[in-house]
Amino acid sequence: MALVASVRVPARVLLRAGARLPGAALGRTERAAGGGDGARRFGSQRVLVEPDAGAGVAVMKFKNPPVNSLSLEFLTELVISLEKLENDKSFRGVILTSDRPGVFSAGLDLTEMCGRSPAHYAGYWKAVQELWLRLYQSNLVLVSAINGACPAGGCLVALTCDYRILADNPRYCIGLNETQLGIIAPFWLKDTLENTIGHRAAERALQLGLLFPPAEALQVGIVDQVVPEEQVQSTALSAIAQWMAIPDHARQLTKAMMRKATASRLVTQRDADVQNFVSFISKDSIQKSLQMYLERLKEEKG
């Protein structure tokens, strides 16, 4: 049960599970261009946060080249960045977007799931679970400004948000295309998609591994707005202002009430979900399929 993309993902050597993450500490700061109230950028190797404390909003930019694949390091840095914003009471909303041209996130990093130990697979899947839970249950207003392709694990990130805005570019598709690679989305992501677009539409999308171009994405309801590419960020700022106009306590309690059942299903089954993932991804047939896919990507790149 993995969330991977059909876009090109580099086959690169990554740190082992539990290894020290270079650049994971979020101690570097610099003054943000145009940031109000003396705001300063902070970030890590793969995540840049541009805060505007005066407005109560931060923009979190993904910058894990070349395609923002969700490696173990990137997952960790995303959670740390979100936690830092949640602990700062001056921030009430976050816009999630990409610093990489043409791609929001290509999904989970296949090299984390191929040729590794069961312990590594378990650690990686726990990190995926943690990111989803932290985003899905966040008290902050989360708006995704989708300025690039958003398949598989990228769609996971977008679906956790309160509001989704997609750039009107036919190359920027969004959806959960796992079945096209012979794998499936986990139950908790299935639930999230079903909550968003309804049972029948989700059933069709998941079985066929559909990726929706902008017009279809808006029609099915997987995104809330489609706007010209140059207007994505400004539209996100306008949208987040609308959400932040609601008193926090009322909005947060309502959000928690609406999402509690879906989140609780994973919280109560986290260990079993990890075991199922490790068992599935360790199968010889799945490993061979992933290895063939990675080799094909190498050949295309070369």
Curated annotation (Swiss-Prot):
Compartments, as annotated in UniProt: Mitochondrion matrix
Site (Important for catalytic activity): E178
Residue list for modification N6-acetyllysine: K61, K89, K283
Residues that coordinate or bind substrate: A106, G107, L108, D109, L110, G153, N177
Pfam (any one): ECH_1
Tissue note: Expressed in liver (at protein level).
A Gene Ontology cellular-component term: mitochondrion
Catalytic activity, reaction form: a (3Z)-enoyl-CoA = a 4-saturated (2E)-enoyl-CoA; a (3E)-enoyl-CoA = a 4-saturated (2E)-enoyl-CoA; (3Z)-octenoyl-CoA = (2E)-octenoyl-CoA; (2E)-tetradecenoyl-CoA = (3Z)-tetradecenoyl-CoA
Gene3D superfamilies: 2-enoyl-CoA Hydratase, Chain A, domain 1, 6.10.250.170
Role of this protein: Key enzyme of fatty acid beta-oxidation. Able to isomerize both 3-cis (3Z) and 3-trans (3E) double bonds into the 2-trans (2E) form in a range of enoyl-CoA species, with a preference for (3Z)-enoyl-CoAs over (3E)-enoyl-CoAs. The catalytic efficiency of this enzyme is not affected by the fatty acyl chain length.
Assembly: Homotrimer.
The name this protein goes by in its record: Enoyl-CoA delta isomerase 1, mitochondrial
Record gene name: ECI1
